[in-house]
Amino acid sequence: MKLNTIAPAAGSKSAPKRLGRGIGSGLGKTSGKGHKGQKARSGGYHKVGFEGGQMPIQRRLPKFGFTSASKRYVAEIRLHELNGLALEEVTVDTLKDSGLIRKDIKSVKIIASGEIQKAVSLKGIACTKGAKEAIEKAGGKVE
């Protein structure tokens, strides 16, 4: 194989539409743009969301809610994810070291999703009522 012999697969490329090249082409005269109007002009189009002067939907509907910036630094961990850890004592730092949470996370909450088979001790980690019951049932403790 040589560089000058490389070609795309047969049928994978189509010839570009040749606009304004006579009636027989099917795209002559107005080149598929119809007659007159803003969209027929060169450079003529509207902004995204423009509705012809009518008040656009993004301005008709009210604003609501906001995103808390502190939420970015709180992680949720499911109960069954603790099974994969080779740790008896679980803290925020040990979770960071194991790669279960990002390094910039400041606090963690365990939620009762799935089951836990091993006894673990949680230190400085919040958990839901159901998760606490499951951890204590498995022989672990929450501090």
Swiss-Prot record:
PROSITE patterns in alphabetical order: RIBOSOMAL_L15 (PS00475)
Molecular-function GO term, any one: structural constituent of ribosome
Q: Which residues cross the membrane?
A: none
Report whether Transmembrane helix shows up as a keyword of the record: no
Annotated coiled-coil positions are: none
Record flagged with keyword Cytoplasm = no
Segments of skewed composition (Gly residues)? 21-31
- Region feature Disordered, mapped onto this chain: 1-51
- Identify the keywords attached in UniProt to this record, alphabetized: Ribonucleoprotein, Ribosomal protein, RNA-binding, rRNA-binding
Any single Gene Ontology cellular-component annotation: cytosolic large ribosomal subunit
A biological process (GO) annotation for this entry? Answer: translation
Cite a single Pfam family from the UniProt record: Ribosomal_L27A
Quaternary organization: Part of the 50S ribosomal subunit.
* Family matches, as NCBIfam families: rplO_bact
The family assignment reads: Belongs to the universal ribosomal protein uL15 family.
Q: What is the recorded function of this protein according to its Swiss-Prot or TrEMBL entry? A: Binds to the 23S rRNA.
Name of this protein: Large ribosomal subunit protein uL15
Q: Which organism is it from?
A: Francisella philomiragia subsp. philomiragia (strain ATCC 25017 / CCUG 19701 / FSC 153 / O#319-036)
User: Source taxonomy lineage?
Assistant: Bacteria, Pseudomonadati, Pseudomonadota, Gammaproteobacteria, Thiotrichales
Gene name tied to this protein: rplO
